[in-house]
């Protein structure tokens, strides 16, 4: 009787963990998987800090539970990536942030290896994740866009002012 209670309790804990993973996967704009084997505790702590600063959640779950959650959501394509020690970065606001942070960190820490991920339901392999990492953050893109709108208006205003000054000098 005592053994049955323990098994039931373990099952409840696992079901709760699968539900938690599913919720994070559903909520995330971008999910990036990385093999973290070989990172020191200090390196892992540094990576987690960088993730937090960018609003990215960085977690390690049992692969079997992550696979169950992915399958329940219909994310079959991502399940093959869960091999070995895998960490998951969940990007909720900026879909490029998890890829960018992990890619930059992997450049200096060769033991961290990008595996792939998922962006808005589409599976990305390692190369696509690296391409995503090259895209500037959302704020930078918006600033560039606004700057490109501002430049023609500024040039036009400069042109109008030059015409006005030319006419004034001709009248004088």
Curated annotation (Swiss-Prot):
| A GO biological-process term | translation
Key words, A-Z: Ribonucleoprotein, Ribosomal protein, RNA-binding, rRNA-binding
Q: What is this protein called?
A: Large ribosomal subunit protein uL10
- Sequence similarity: Belongs to the universal ribosomal protein uL10 family.
Specify the domain of life of the species encoding this protein. Answer: Bacteria
Give GO MF terms, alphabetically: large ribosomal subunit rRNA binding
Q: Record's Gene Ontology CC terms? A: ribonucleoprotein complex; ribosome
Quaternary organization:
Part of the ribosomal stalk of the 50S ribosomal subunit. The N-terminus interacts with L11 and the large rRNA to form the base of the stalk. The C-terminus forms an elongated spine to which L12 dimers bind in a sequential fashion forming a multimeric L10(L12)X complex.
Protein role: Forms part of the ribosomal stalk, playing a central role in the interaction of the ribosome with GTP-bound translation factors.
* SUPFAM superfamilies noted in UniProt: Ribosomal protein L10-like
């Amino acid at each position: 009787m005592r053994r049955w209670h323990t098994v039931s309790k373990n099952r409840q804990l696992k079901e709760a963990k699968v539900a938690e993973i599913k919720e994070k996967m559903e909520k995330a704009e971008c999910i990036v998987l990385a093999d973290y084997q070989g990172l020191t505790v200090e390196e892992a702590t540094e990576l987690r800090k960088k993730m937090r600063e960018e609003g990215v959640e960085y977690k390690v779950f049992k692969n079997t539970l992550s696979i169950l959650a992915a399958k329940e959501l219909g994310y079959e394509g991502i399940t093959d990536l869960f091999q070995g020690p895998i960490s998951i970065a969940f990007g909720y606001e900026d879909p490029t942030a998890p890829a960018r942070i992990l890619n930059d960190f992997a450049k200096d820490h060769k033991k961290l290896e990008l595996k792939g991920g998922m962006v808005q339901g589409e599976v990305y392999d390692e190369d696509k994740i690296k391409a995503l990492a090259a895209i500037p953050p959302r704020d930078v893109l918006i600033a560039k866009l606004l700057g490109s709108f501002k430049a023609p208006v500024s040039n036009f205003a400069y042109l109008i002012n030059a015409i006005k000054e030319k006419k004034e000098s001709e009248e004088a």
